Structure formats: structure tokens, C-alpha cells
Amino acid sequence: MPGAALPSLLAWLAVLLLGRARPADACSCSPIHPQQAFCNADVVIRAKRVSAKEVDSGNDIYGNPIKRIQYEVKQIKMFKGPDQDIEFIYTAPSTEVCGQPLDTGGKKEYLIAGKSEGDGKMHITLCDLVATWDSVSPTQKKSLNQRYQMGCECKISRCLSIPCFVSSSDECLWTDWAMEKIVGGRQAKHYACIKRSDGSCAWYRGMAPPKQEFLDIEDP
């Protein structure tokens, strides 16, 4: 069973920045803003791990059994996903094949984003957003309820060096790496890219929901 402690949200972002330079059959992750991870996911939940076991999940093209880790979880809150609670989370058996380990202690709460498998099940990989709940900033926690969803039609583009420019009005530049040399910087922790009434997108910072004046602003 996987026993490594789960990294914090900032560590997850750092892992994505470094990527996964592994063989062709392994996974490779590109850094993304937490809002992008939310928007790309079918399911986003806050949950606690209850138990874990290795299970068979069919066979590969050569007839060999495919192993996966099945985590039984207790869902605390669903931010995005089906009406049915998530009871089981599946992942590959090791990080070498893109598996995402959860802490074996079972006491930590996590923010988990991944793909739905239906019937109360979901699948996660090393590239998905999985972080200890305590490592999620207060602004990020607020954004999970509505703000991230308000910008899922926007495009967040990573800026690697200054200067960089938007290519369209529905784009937000993610400059944490260019400005701070980290991916888990101020924009990742405190900002959401929100679509405004004129169709343009802009970064919004703050705990409170955006005021109508912000949403009604039009780009010149």
C-alpha cells in the first residue's frame, strides 16, 4: 500500500512545474492554476481517507491483470460533481505510473479533484489537484464554492518571463513563475480568473464575492 504523506497544495504545484520526466508509458504533468484543476475535473470534493486496498481492474491487452489502489473515503463536502456522494477513489498503484498516494494515517482531510467513474466512484492521477485541506488558502476555499466556476469559460495562460501579453480578452495571465519564481504564488493562492458581463475575463482577489460593479466593467 502507498504510505507516503500527501504533499501540500504548494508542493502539488511545484511537482507540476518540475514535471514528470519518466519513460514514455509514465505520466507527465504540466503546471496549472488551481482554478484550472477545478474546471478540468468532473468531481471536486473535501474528504477523509478511511481505508485502502489493491484491487484488480480488468486486464491489459496482453491479458495481465491491471492493479489499482482503491481508497474508501468519507466525503465531507462536494464542490463539483454528481448528486451521489463519492465513496471510493481509484488510482494507479505507484507514482511511477501516475498513481496519487493518500496518507495512510486516515486522519487528514483532503481537497481532491479528479474524473468521475459513476456510481459513487472517481479516479485520480498524480497530475490531478490533491492537497491536504489545511494547505488550501482561505481564498481558495471560498473560491471552490462558486468563484472558480465563474471563470471556467476563461483561459488562464502561464507567463514564463516578463513581458508577456494576453492574446484575447477572455484570457488571464498567470505570472507567479515570472514574478516570484514559484508556481504557488499570490495568484495561485489568492486570485480567481472571472468572466465579466461583456465576455472579458480578469483576475479577482478577495474573500467576498465579486461586486456587480466588477462584473459589469467593460474592457476599453
From Swiss-Prot:
What GO CC annotations are associated with the protein?
extracellular matrix; extracellular space
Which pairs are disulfide-linked? 27-98, 29-127, 39-152, 154-201, 159-164, 172-193
Residues covered by the NTR domain: 27-152
In which domain of life is the source organism classified?
Eukaryota
**Segments passing through the bilayer:** none
Could you tell me what this protein does?
Complexes with metalloproteinases (such as collagenases) and irreversibly inactivates them by binding to their catalytic zinc cofactor.
Please give the Gene Ontology molecular function terms for this protein. metal ion binding; metalloendopeptidase inhibitor activity
In this record, what's one Pfam family? Answer: TIMP
UniProt organism field: Gallus gallus
Region called Involved in metalloproteinase-binding, residue ranges: 27-30, 95-96
BP term (GO), one: response to cytokine
Classification via InterPro entries: Netrin_domain, TIMP, TIMP-like_OB-fold, TIMP_C, TIMP_CS
**Gene3D superfamilies membership:** 2.40.50.120, Tissue inhibitor of metalloproteinase-1. Chain B, domain 1
Signal peptide range? 1-26
Which controlled-vocabulary keywords does the entry list? Answer: Disulfide bond, Metal-binding, Metalloenzyme inhibitor, Metalloprotease inhibitor, Protease inhibitor, Secreted, Signal, Zinc
Q: Which PROSITE patterns match?
A: NTR, TIMP
Q: What is the lineage of its organism?
A: Eukaryota, Metazoa, Chordata, Craniata, Vertebrata
Protein name (Swiss-Prot/TrEMBL) = Metalloproteinase inhibitor 2
Q: List site positions: Involved in metalloproteinase-binding.
A: 40, 61, 67
